[in-house]
Amino acid sequence: ISFEVEKGEFIAIMGASGSGKTTLLNCISTLDKVSSGKIYMEGDDITRLKGNQLNRFRREKLGFIFQEFNLLDTLTAFENIALALSIQNVPAVEITKRVHAMAEELDIESVLSKYPYEMSGGQKQRVACARAMVTDPGLVLADEPTGALDSRSARMLLESFQTLNREMQATILMVTHDAFTASYAGRVIFIKDGKLFHELRKGNASRREFFDQIMDVVTLLGGDLNHAI
């Protein structure tokens, strides 16, 4: 597989179960090692990073959003978001400023003092999104981020992704098997049997028009993919 991601792009990676999309994400995140080939980010081959260099790369350059939120139950929403900055030794005043700015962007100011068990699934995922974005990473990796959400919460999260992409120039790489979710991206890469199958760009199309284009490819691709509008 060979493709490029430009700074500020919002890309969805689609494919049936077992197609290799999550493995691809794991390789880009350096959680899995590649057996061959190279992965470049900002001019550096990240497959060659080891030890402290690798830890620093993950901490400073990547943001992660998972299907199951992965929030710490003993911390409030504010503390969960702030943790990523505390690890980087950001001053407390700056942490407070950045957490509140991100919370305002994602409309979660009202839950900052709440613990995960006090929040809805959609709120928890937006807190997780804020945690991933607050460090201003070079790349945000999202693995099935809407998988545990109802349709309303999923739509709100995806609209938040679009806002962050547009206003903060956030670079987002999102794995999904859902055409509705993918239709919020600006580009969709389709993978089949570990290989690049097709690629679509949204251009000036509406979200619904792009959804229809995605569904045309899904029909050709086959496999276990969702068809919700």
Language model region names:
Residues 195-220:
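Conserved beta-strand-loop-alpha-helix hinge in the C-terminal portion
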